Amino acid sequence: MAYSDDTESDIIVPKKWYDKLPREAWSKYEKIDQPDNWFEVYRLTDFVYAIYEDGHFEEVISYLVLGDEKAVLIDTANGIGDIKALVEKLTDLPILVVNTHTHLDHIGGNNQFRKIATPDTPYSREQAVKGRTKASTGNYLDGDMVWNPNNR
């Protein structure tokens, strides 16, 4: 991993980024008690949950929006945790997955769902055909990119 001497402005991977967790911004929301230690879940409104991955440097946030007949999961995080099992604990509604775009931190859990709605762009189509190899995602899990949320 590349680090700079100025950890405040290092946008690649700041040293010990996880020391600043939990983020103060989450304190104004109700934290939902749930058994998955990879994700934190916050109720933003009566019908919207934020599913937050604080164990990865990118601190990915997916959203579960509850409707009358279906729920929409906006992005499936980076694929480290079991996001499907988690959303099934939060709702009994059928789940429709919508990806905002096709970067790994937004589609990592797509394989857990049957139907996915994603933008129809040349990049998205190329990624769907190519897929991801272990070699292409290995650095996503290297060094300080991931920390152990069990140490909270």
Mark where each language-model region is.
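Homeobox/homeodomain signature
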Residues: 8, 31-34, 38-41, 55, ...
